[in-house]
Amino acid sequence: MTSTTPPKLNALEILDLRSSPPAFTTPSKRINEGSDVARFLTSLAYRDIGVFILQLNRALCPRNQSSSPLPRTFPLNSKPATTPSVQTLQALLAKIGSFIDEAPPDPGPRRFGNVSFRKWHAIFEERLSELLDEGLLGETLKVGDGKAKEEVSLYLLGGFGSVQRLDYGTGHELSFVAFLGCLWKLGFFKDGEQGGEIEREIVLKIIEPYLNVVRKLILTYTLEPAGSHGVWGLDDHSFMPYIFGSAQLTRPINENEPMPLEGSVKGAPKPSDVTKAVVVEDQRQVNMYFSAIGFINDVKKGPFWEHSPILFDISGIRDGWGKINKGMIKMFNAEVLSKFPVVQHFPFGSLFSWDVDPDATTPTQSVHMVNQPAMAAPTPSGPGTSAPWAQATRMPPSGPGIPYSRMPPPGPNSGSLARPPRNTSGTGSTDAQITVTKAPWARDS
């Protein structure tokens, strides 16, 4: 007889601020050279960010309904947010985006980035304290005699690009996710129904609007990709929409089930539809994955397989969006959380701690771990440097995640940049090829 006991589903802890408040502190840099990445992968900060991302990811998975043969899905254009905490952050993002009107792009010639981004960032930084004092946000951040506000503000400030390098990348994106994680720990989202509903609002009604603000910044100030692999990276700027967008399209589950490892919800677009402009334009209104693809189409010209070969390869996966979602999480762990250039600026405080996770396993000396720069290249100090610090948490085994599974159109396919051969087993496997660490929340189930 099959057990009906629901599996334990991890969620980020909400702190008891009355009886056991944390000793808030100004977050500081701890990752100074490549060898520090292995230590980061055993930290409480790494664990907590991973738990939070997987918690949000599962909330987006379609659900079976006892009252209907049709599953419940969670599109971007679902009903407007009604939770006060979510509405507060939507208003915050709207104000941050409005600062663009006060810092129009410089019309002069430039090679990289528009210097007016520095003016925009200065306005943002100048008004940051005031923004965090307003309404529900201000009430939450009063804890610790204002020290919580000081700690949390660094993560929000780090979420909108580098004022020195005039760039934006996955580290900045994760800085914003960490800001949300801080608020979760402080109980800011307790006014919503936890265990699915409030998590969905966080992704669809906060993270997607955040991405829209960032995309406007990128277009307005021609921000460079931060730490980009060029065309051989997944995306020039973001990773979150590919995780959450693939989750939106996975096979439906019951509330007591873990995330599916393969399959798609009925009626979902095919993975290969990312190459069809008409489908992308339609789906970008309802799905985060296609919204990100749509932005790529807005800013890049030429064949999709040529300017986005990794996404093109992924579009050949035959086991559905569940398989892609599983692989995206593994790829995120390998290409963001385990890479020194991305995590080197991650600031550690009381909410995302450098302390060792007692349940962490020792990271394996994999290709990812060995091939780390010895030390960061020197960069100017000052505001805006606290961002390229992708976070993590014992995420699934670190590895490429999604192997090359789709061949490009006929043409040259040799040389140092030739794409790896397609999977010979024909399964489109997304099993990790390189393991960094195996966390309690990362085990396949």
Curated annotation (Swiss-Prot):
Transmembrane regions listed in the UniProt entry? none
Q: Which residues form a coiled coil?
A: none
Q: Which residue stretches belong to region Disordered?
A: 374-445
Task: Report the CDD domains cross-referenced here.
Answer: PTPA (cd04087)
Report a single Gene Ontology molecular function: peptidyl-prolyl cis-trans isomerase activity
Q: What does this protein do?
A: PPIases accelerate the folding of proteins. It catalyzes the cis-trans isomerization of proline imidic peptide bonds in oligopeptides. Acts as a regulatory subunit for PP2A-like phosphatases modulating their activity or substrate specificity, probably by inducing a conformational change in the catalytic subunit, a direct target of the PPIase. Can reactivate inactive phosphatase PP2A-phosphatase methylesterase complexes (PP2Ai) in presence of ATP and Mg(2+) by dissociating the inactive form from the complex.
Q: Could you identify this protein by its name?
A: Serine/threonine-protein phosphatase 2A activator 1
Q: Species name for this entry? A: Gibberella zeae (strain ATCC MYA-4620 / CBS 123657 / FGSC 9075 / NRRL 31084 / PH-1)
